[in-house]
Amino acid sequence: MTDSRFRRLPVGIQSFKVIREENYLYVDKSDIVWNMVNLGDKYNYLSRPRRFGKSVLVDTLESYLEGRKDLFEGLKIMQLEKDWKQYPVIRLDMSRGGANEDTLRSYLNLRFKDYEEKYNITPDPTAMLADRFHAIIATAYKQTGLRVAVLIDEYDSPLQHSWRTPEHEKCTGVYREVFAILKADDEYEHFIFITGITKFTQISLFSVLNNLSNISFMPEYATICGITEEEIKENFMPELKQMSEANNWSVQETHDRLKAYYDGYHFSRRNMVDVYNPYSLVNALKSKEIINFWASSGATSLLPKFIDNAELRLSKFENCSVMRNTLELSDVSGGGAELFLYQSGYLTIKDSDEFGYILGFPNEEVKQALYETVLPALAMRSESEILSLQACLYRYLGTGQIDEAMNSLKALIADVPYSNKKLASMDMEERYRLIISTILNAIGLNVEVEKMISTGRIDMTVKTSRYIYVIELKLRNNGGKVAATEQILNRQYMEPFKADKRKVIGLGIELDENGKGLLDWKRAE
């Protein structure tokens, strides 16, 4: 038996062959793969967020369709598959297609050349890409006697990266030209599988392949990517225990922290099983640390392209309503901010009814990453200017150093409510509330804005591992810090938190009515 200390976690590995041959841990999805190929539809599209295991899934499909029985020994599929046919497979990884027409054509040209060499095809020098694609599919079928499987990974990558540039329409034209052949060559094809993040319906994959099944919301595929609670218990208990020991936490506490930070995705209204982000979970178990892996994965880079003024709209994204057709059928370019945020993994399904879906943040990691991304635009400062002040604020709030924390916050918000013209439609106190809550969310604290209790509405509660801050904001011309602390005490805002083991601190903050920033503060005691 392998010593649990030396079990190999597949951090960053996307090759199913490498995972199996080099003895990395593998969460067995092979039964779902078999069901999809043998019992599902012929043409399939699956949308999942970035870093959610789509490429490993495509690689698993390729190995299965090529009949690599040796790689599946001991997995669930061995009880299902009897024939192990070796289908010809054509695989395209569109994440290598760049962000302009020339790079896209160059990638397809090189990939088609590989398959032309494999099947001894000599293309006409003047042949269009679509003609070459057809020749590859038809020849592969004729030479092997088996219909062809076509796997297209990250189909939307060139379209995402060219969005809102002159190259986007050119890239769309390439897609229409090349991939329309998939419908025309139906007689030669066994199985088509396409993955992506965002859905552009106006290209040939969706407008021409009108028989393409969007399996993204189907209950039987809700867990085809990602890791479930049950799969953690089956596969990762030794790593969970090691992480507990390394941090002096109980196993239950470690589990609860991982769940709060990386779990919470739901992909089907008819199968609301919780799904962890596999990239973040495996990285956390490997490093034995709970940190934000999402932000470093490149998942936030496209946000400004698809959402205008996101920094002003964050509070509206929690528990937002979306019509079912919008979420399941609409084009990302016209479906609104909520659609992009769902497809890219910032939001997930929280509930559904006959009126549509309720969306919200899946977990703390994603919520923090989103707030971090928009903070520079809101604070009108560069990321480098903000980082050191954020680090100080996080440390001081975590250790109960009130004066030092308030001075860091003061430096972060100086002049912002006055200078940021995007805030002009808000009243001044609302501007401060937005800015301060965004800053606190961006450093990963648990923040509730305008929390209702029996005696009133608290402006803000902020929770760290050792402290709970009950905060009231007041403009100077509305009584300032004195009125704020009196309100905390008179309305007993701290009482609901007294049973918590953490120390409760009431804090009145005085703000300049002209938007020049934080003036003073006072503890409520």
Language-model features and meaning:
Residues 430, 434-438, 468, 486:
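Feature representing long, continuous alpha-helical segments
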Residues 496, 502-525:
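Domain-level recognition of nuclease-like catalytic cores that cleave nucleotide substrates
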Residues 149, 467-471, 505:
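Structural motif
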Residues 169-175, 475-494:
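Mg2+/Mn2+-dependent nuclease catalytic core
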Residues 1-428, 443:
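Phosphate-binding site recognition
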